[in-house]
């Protein structure tokens, strides 16, 4: 009597994603490929056949978190593949930093290395044989597994950066700018909208430079020519989003003159009037030491023009306080800039050495106490500006995208307006609907009248 063969155990992969949204999209790509090949994911290190850690390596805190996570995975599992930005960093002896600290990891790759990672996975954890899955063509889907909630997603349009800012080591880890074909980007965007995404967050290392590397060559989408350039891409994304009743939000936008052409699209309502612009500083001399691609005076003039063309525009930015050689006068210039530009949302880091960054060799390194003191002073001014702008929202009616619903949507909720990007900005606390028949549902848009503020957040009631 023949005995049926027991099915082979499906390999399980543990996965940890650390760092920024750009890293998150790399993780989504890997998870999509793992799923397409028949692997399952494990929620614990112990329950996995091996673990992949996608690391961040930009600042010291991120390096420590990544190394600690790798150590934890090794202790609880023993088989670990490391990928991401930290994988590209050299250690004290000139070798790979991860290998120096954790020599027992199976393999180390840099960022954006899905094929390399999959080859290591195949070596140490052969993919399951499935006669049906084996018929599926290889490659990555347009909109595979997402690590964000279903109603919003990140859309990465390029990889790498052509700038050589002295405080940054990202080009050494992620390379020069490589723009995705415009047709591929739009294809993924459509798949995301078709899948229920209500907010598309456009990301890259330098969104404004999209297409520079390919000399803005003409691509094709839906049988029609489209230039590989930020303006044309944003216009197409906005038009597409409008047909689905969705939002498009722009991140990591360097303040090039070409950005001026995008502001009218915001004024027309085609894309959200929101710009995430990494200014880093305002004083011309500091910007020169940073090797930033813009001057402080032009930045202020540009912002004022943007606000004139689109009064509703919200500007988020990040800054560095205590950069090597920064004088008190230069720092005061930065504080004045934040007030005059009326930066809606601002974050600030006290300058810290990043191994491999050119800024480490600059003269005039300031004591850490002074750097931290300036960061605190900056944040006090930034919060003054932000608080005043939030207060002016009281009485307005705003469209809010619901992120959380309490008590089946009858006891209130939490959402965001056009002025709030997920995780980095404030939220709108939604009070319970006055009519019992009304409920909040995650991923829905609601109209809310703003009745108050709460720290960095707003409070609204449905209308």
UniProtKB/Swiss-Prot annotation:
<keyword id="KW-0408">Iron</keyword>
<protein>
    <recommendedName>
        <fullName>Ribosomal protein uS12 methylthiotransferase RimO</fullName>
        <ecNumber>2.8.4.4</ecNumber>
    </recommendedName>
</protein>
<feature type="binding site">
    <location>
        <position position="161"/>
    </location>
    <ligand>
        <name>[4Fe-4S] cluster 2</name>
    </ligand>
</feature>
<dbReference type="Pfam" id="PF04055">
    <property type="entry name" value="Radical_SAM"/>
</dbReference>
<dbReference type="Pfam" id="PF18693">
    <property type="entry name" value="TRAM_2"/>
</dbReference>
<keyword id="KW-0004">4Fe-4S</keyword>
<keyword id="KW-0808">Transferase</keyword>
<dbReference type="GO" id="GO:0035599">
    <property type="term" value="F:aspartic acid methylthiotransferase activity"/>
</dbReference>
<keyword id="KW-0411">Iron-sulfur</keyword>
<dbReference type="GO" id="GO:0051539">
    <property type="term" value="F:4 iron, 4 sulfur cluster binding"/>
</dbReference>
<dbReference type="InterPro" id="IPR020612">
    <property type="entry name" value="Methylthiotransferase_CS"/>
</dbReference>
<comment type="similarity">
    <text>Belongs to the methylthiotransferase family. RimO subfamily.</text>
</comment>
<dbReference type="InterPro" id="IPR002792">
    <property type="entry name" value="TRAM_dom"/>
</dbReference>
<keyword id="KW-0963">Cytoplasm</keyword>
<feature type="domain" description="Radical SAM core">
    <location>
        <begin position="147"/>
        <end position="388"/>
    </location>
</feature>
<feature type="binding site">
    <location>
        <position position="168"/>
    </location>
    <ligand>
        <name>[4Fe-4S] cluster 2</name>
    </ligand>
</feature>
<feature type="binding site">
    <location>
        <position position="56"/>
    </location>
    <ligand>
        <name>[4Fe-4S] cluster 1</name>
    </ligand>
</feature>
<dbReference type="GO" id="GO:0005829">
    <property type="term" value="C:cytosol"/>
</dbReference>
<dbReference type="GO" id="GO:0103039">
    <property type="term" value="F:protein methylthiotransferase activity"/>
</dbReference>
<dbReference type="GO" id="GO:0006400">
    <property type="term" value="P:tRNA modification"/>
</dbReference>
<keyword id="KW-0949">S-adenosyl-L-methionine</keyword>
<dbReference type="Pfam" id="PF00919">
    <property type="entry name" value="UPF0004"/>
</dbReference>
<dbReference type="InterPro" id="IPR038135">
    <property type="entry name" value="Methylthiotransferase_N_sf"/>
</dbReference>
<dbReference type="InterPro" id="IPR023404">
    <property type="entry name" value="rSAM_horseshoe"/>
</dbReference>
<dbReference type="InterPro" id="IPR013848">
    <property type="entry name" value="Methylthiotransferase_N"/>
</dbReference>
<feature type="binding site">
    <location>
        <position position="165"/>
    </location>
    <ligand>
        <name>[4Fe-4S] cluster 2</name>
    </ligand>
</feature>
<dbReference type="InterPro" id="IPR012340">
    <property type="entry name" value="NA-bd_OB-fold"/>
</dbReference>
<feature type="binding site">
    <location>
        <position position="20"/>
    </location>
    <ligand>
        <name>[4Fe-4S] cluster 1</name>
    </ligand>
</feature>
<dbReference type="InterPro" id="IPR006638">
    <property type="entry name" value="Elp3/MiaA/NifB-like_rSAM"/>
</dbReference>
<feature type="domain" description="TRAM">
    <location>
        <begin position="391"/>
        <end position="463"/>
    </location>
</feature>
<feature type="binding site">
    <location>
        <position position="85"/>
    </location>
    <ligand>
        <name>[4Fe-4S] cluster 1</name>
    </ligand>
</feature>
<keyword id="KW-0479">Metal-binding</keyword>
<feature type="domain" description="MTTase N-terminal">
    <location>
        <begin position="11"/>
        <end position="126"/>
    </location>
</feature>
<dbReference type="InterPro" id="IPR007197">
    <property type="entry name" value="rSAM"/>
</dbReference>
<dbReference type="InterPro" id="IPR005839">
    <property type="entry name" value="Methylthiotransferase"/>
</dbReference>
<comment type="function">
    <text>Catalyzes the methylthiolation of an aspartic acid residue of ribosomal protein uS12.</text>
</comment>
<dbReference type="GO" id="GO:0046872">
    <property type="term" value="F:metal ion binding"/>
</dbReference>
<dbReference type="InterPro" id="IPR005840">
    <property type="entry name" value="Ribosomal_uS12_MeSTrfase_RimO"/>
</dbReference>
């Amino acid at each position: 009597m023949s005995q049926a063969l027991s099915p082979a155990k499906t390999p399980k992969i543990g996965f940890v994603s650390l760092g920024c949204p750009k890293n998150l999209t790399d993780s989504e790509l890997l998870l999509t490929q793992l799923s397409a090949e028949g692997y399952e994911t494990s929620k614990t290190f112990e329950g996995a056949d091996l673990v992949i850690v996608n690391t961040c390596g930009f600042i010291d805190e991120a390096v420590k978190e990544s190394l600690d996570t790798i150590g934890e995975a090794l202790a609880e599992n023993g088989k670990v593949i490391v990928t991401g930005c930290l994988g590209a960093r050299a250690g004290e002896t000139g070798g790979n930093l991860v290998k120096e600290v954790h020599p027992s990891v199976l393999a180390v790759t840099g960022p954006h290395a899905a094929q390399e990672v999959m080859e290591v996975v195949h070596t140490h954890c052969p993919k399951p044989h499935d006669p049906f899955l084996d018929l599926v063509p290889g490659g990555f889907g347009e909109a595979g597994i997402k690590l964000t909630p279903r109603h919003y997603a990140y859309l990465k349009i390029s990889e790498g950066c052509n700038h050589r800012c002295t405080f940054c080591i990202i080009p050494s880890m992620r390379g020069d700018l490589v723009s995705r074909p415009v047709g591929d980007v739009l294809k993924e965007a459509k798949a995301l909208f078709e899948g229920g995404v209500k907010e598309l967050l456009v990301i890259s290392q330098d969104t404004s430079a999209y297409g520079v590397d390919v000399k803005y060559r003409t691509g094709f989408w839906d049988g029609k020519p489209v230039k590989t350039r930020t303006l044309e891409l944003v216009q197409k994304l906005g038009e597409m989003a409008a047909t689905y009743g969705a939002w498009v939000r722009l991140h990591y936008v360097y303040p090039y003159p070409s950005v001026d052409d995008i502001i009218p699209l915001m004024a027309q309502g085609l894309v959200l009037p929101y710009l995430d612009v990494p200014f880093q500083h305002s004083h011309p001399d500091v910007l020169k030491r940073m090797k930033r691609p813009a001057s402080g005076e032009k930045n202020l003039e540009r912002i004022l023009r943007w606000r004139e063309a689109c009064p509703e525009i919200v500007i988020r930015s990040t800054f560095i306080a205590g950069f090597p050689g920064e004088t008190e006068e230069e720092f005061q210039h930065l504080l004045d800039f934040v007030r005059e530009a009326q930066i809606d949302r601002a974050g600030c880091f006290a300058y810290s050495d990043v191994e491999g960054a050119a800024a480490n060799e600059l003269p005039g390194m300031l004591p850490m106490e002074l750097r931290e003191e300036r960061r605190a002073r900056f944040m006090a001014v930034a919060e003054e500006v932000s608080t005043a702008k939030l207060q002016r929202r009281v009485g307005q009616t705003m469209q809010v995208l619901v992120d959380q619903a309490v008590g089946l949507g009858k006891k209130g909720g939490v959402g965001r307006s056009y002025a709030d990007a997920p995780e980095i900005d404030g939220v709108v606390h939604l009070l319970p609907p006055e009519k019992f028949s009304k409920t909040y549902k995650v991923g829905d848009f609601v109209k809310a009248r703003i009745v108050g503020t709460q720290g960095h957040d707003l409070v609204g009631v449905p209308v």
